[in-house]
Curated annotation (Swiss-Prot):
CC cofactor note: Binds 1 zinc ion per subunit.
Residues holding Zn(2+): 109, 114, 138, 141
Domain of life: Bacteria
Sequence similarity: Belongs to the PyrI family.
Gene Ontology MF terms in the entry: metal ion binding
Role, per record: Involved in allosteric regulation of aspartate carbamoyltransferase.
BP term (GO), one: 'de novo' pyrimidine nucleobase biosynthetic process
Chain ranges passing through the membrane: none
Subunit structure: Contains catalytic and regulatory chains.
Protein's name according to its UniProt entry: Aspartate carbamoyltransferase regulatory chain
Organismal lineage: Bacteria, Pseudomonadati, Pseudomonadota, Gammaproteobacteria, Aeromonadales
Length: 154
């Protein structure tokens, strides 16, 4: 393989590749979506060269196929990312991300008075984009927050 075609992060036989993640968001995605808790091998590249982004992060998860719903939740941090499903070292499906209608069990509500902090319920937010700003509305306290406020503690 010539130097020009050499992969910056090792290829995987089967699994999912999260590509075109803005530089610096990869670690947040690993933590928030608990990807580091899997027993499967994860290969990560930070600040890799990217023609479109300048620099990007890349996450490869072996033997794990992200669902469309899981992939779309990533759009909160990497709206231009793609999730590629790999089988026998080849891309068999490429998923362009879309903001999900809701996101459950990932974030904690920033409202300290919200019942989701004291009751055995999963967090649940409706997601909306208004004039380019992503807002998340808690199902329980009905307060709206920007995506960066909801995710700032991660």
């Amino acid at each position: 393989m010539s130097e020009k075609n050499q992969l910056q992060v090792e290829a995987i036989r089967h699994g999912s590749v999260i590509d075109h993640v803005p530089a610096g968001q990869g670690i947040k995605i690993l933590k928030l979506f608990q990807l580091i808790e899997t027993q499967e091998r994860i290969t990560v590249g930070f600040n890799l060269k990217s023609g479109a982004l300048g620099k990007k992060d890349l996450i490869k998860i072996e033997n794990t196929r992200l669902t469309e719903q899981q992939a779309n939740q990533l759009a909160l941090f990497a709206p231009k990312a793609t999730v590629n499903i790999i089988e026998d070292f080849a891309v068999v499906k490429k998923h362009q991300l879309e903001l999900p209608e809701f996101i459950a069990g990932v974030f904690h509500c920033p409202n300290s008075n919200c019942i989701s902090h004291n009751e055995p319920v999963d967090s649940y937010f409706r997601v909306r984009e208004v004039k380019g700003v992503v807002r998340m509305k808690c199902k329980y306290c009905e307060k709206s927050f920007t995506q960066d406020i909801v995710s700032e503690r991660y």
